[in-house]
Amino acid sequence: MTILAIAAAAWILLHLLVAGALRPAIAGRIGENAFRGLFSVLSAISLGFLIWAYRGTPFVPLWDLGIGAVHMAKLLVFIACFLLVGSLTPRNPNLAGAELVLKDTLPAEGLIRVTRHPMLWAFTFWAIAHLLANGNLAALLLFGAILVVALNGMYSIDRKQHRRHGAAWDAFAAQTSLVPFLAIAQGRNRFVFREYGLARVIIACALFLILMYGHGYVIGRDVTG
């Protein structure tokens, strides 16, 4: 369990410190592109270490929320699939070049109308789902670490984009929201289904089925029941 705790701490500190407070100094010395490449490699290594440590950790039960929590977990994964697929769009300034997207008067479209961080919300719901369905210490360390990084990432990206793009980012942020559907509820935007598209709905549903039926083969635990 100690190794898993170290791996979880390393994963969190990598994202909170290296991608946070230390990023300007490091990127200033090696360049932004080199930093992105280095951080991607370090993230992959850290995630691999985290997963490896998790698989070798003994089972220590903490809670059992019953079958209702399992069904809720499946619903959250289903929603996460739609968020993940919807985030993979060239109109997402957090994935594509923000300068190209933010130059438009109305850059928020598709799922970005719902939240400006659909991918990180997908990881958030995915992590919560696994915490609901796996009430043990190892799961808490693994999925808790992923949850912390995903939630912190939303605020970190907002701060970073504001520093880089100033008024252009503020205008974009005013059209959307960090919390899903908040901008729509406040009348600052509206959801347009055709911008999400039937193709993405089909892909999201297919992804969910692949995750459900492939879970037993890859992870060794059947979740289709």
Name every feature range the model reports, one short phrase each.
Residues 4-6, 37, 72-74, 78, ...:
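Hydrophobic alpha-helical transmembrane segments
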Residues 160-195:
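Membrane-proximal soluble regions of multi-pass membrane proteins
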Residues 39-112:
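Portal/gating segments that form or line small-molecule/metal binding sites
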Residues 1-13:
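Hydrophobic transmembrane alpha-helical segments in integral membrane proteins
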Residues 107-119, 183-204:
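Loop-to-transmembrane boundary segments
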Residues 112-167:
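A contiguous pocket-lining binding segment that forms or flanks enzyme active sites
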Residues 16-35:
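Membrane-interface helix-loop junction between the first two transmembrane segments
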Residues 209-225:
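Juxtamembrane boundary at the C-terminal end of a transmembrane helix
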